Amino acid sequence: MKNPFQKINLLILFAVLLFSACKKDSQEISDFEYIGFPNENELSWDYPTKPGSDKWKTFQSHNEMLEACQIPSTILTNLSTEELFLICLKYPLLMDISAFNFVTDGYASYETNFNGIREFYQRSNASSVIYSYYQQVKLEKNNATLYSTISFVFRVSVIEYMISVSPVISKYSTTQRKEVATELLSKLNIKKSQKGDFPETYLNSTYRALIRIIRCDEAGTLSTDDTKLANYFAGGFSAPESIIAQVDEIIRQYLK
């Protein structure tokens, strides 16, 4: 007959092993670092010339505006990744992205014309910074002070592109990709539940981000032979129900 103390010791050992296994699994599911962000109005650097200012009104060309928005090289490399990310979101010409027929062309222009976003994508912790920030974005009406404004909704779409762009995707582990996809799906469901406040365009930004996370390789190449899906991915049109249903199934299969 076994000593009752031996039974207790075995139970304790089993509990410890179970806890250790659970802890290990948890770490494998999420190894993103939680990051706090500074107040956007108290950054160490801000754009000296902005739309509406007297200086801005003197510009005669778009190139002058682009030049005025560059971050000085002596400052750029010394900014923390958190600050740099927020500065990228405050880029005065950010809305230029929406001036293109294809979403991908708009973001390509942003990356070509702004040294801040190029530097951000090169940072080793860019993926952790942007994911941590996206997690903290509140889409519920009672939590978002700028909820119904175009600028807030557009900003969310920009973040969703950035979180799924190839230089950031290349930094994700397999488990991190799934975690990002899960967070995107959560945000998508909130948007769907409040569709009157989120135009179809901004539902598409989440769908496209999910496609990039699930179907793109590290170079950002979409793995599909489906022309319609490829065109939707590029942002050439708003998706018909058949494409949305297809994407929903891709998401379901990936996260099941």
Briefly describe each language-model feature range.
Residues 45-55, 59-256:
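Non-catalytic all-alpha helical scaffold/repeat segments
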Residues 1-20:
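Sec-dependent bacterial lipoprotein signal peptides
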Residues 19-40:
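Bacterial Sec-dependent N-terminal signal peptides
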Residues 8, 40-42:
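Residue-level detector of functional hotspots within protein domains
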Residues 2, 36, 46-49:
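Selective for proline/serine-rich intrinsically disordered segments
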